[in-house]
Amino acid sequence: MVKIRLARFGSKHNPHYPHYRIVVTDARRKRDGKYIEKIGYYDPRKTTPDWLKVDVERARYWLSVGAQPTDTARRLLRQAGVFRQEAREGA
């Protein structure tokens, strides 16, 4: 099964300042392991204006082929507007 989830990265010397990539990966892989595609970026400390970036087109593609987002990834994708157009098209 393919998942959309967060992969932690950033400085090893400062564990209190994590950053995350929003990635598409096989569900059996490690959290920070090899991934199929990077579709976004998330900074939980919101230190920059672009603290959340998502390639909406690619996210919609992966969702259309059956990728399952984790709860946190789903919340971030919703915040980025990935689900907005789909809801309007279906109505």
From Swiss-Prot:
GO terms for cellular component: cytoplasm; small ribosomal subunit. One of its GO terms (molecular function) is structural constituent of ribosome. InterPro entries: Ribosomal_bS16 (IPR000307), Ribosomal_bS16_dom_sf (IPR023803). Belongs to the bacterial ribosomal protein bS16 family. Binds to the lower part of the body of the 30S subunit, where it stabilizes two of its domains. Part of the 30S ribosomal subunit. This is Small ribosomal subunit protein bS16.
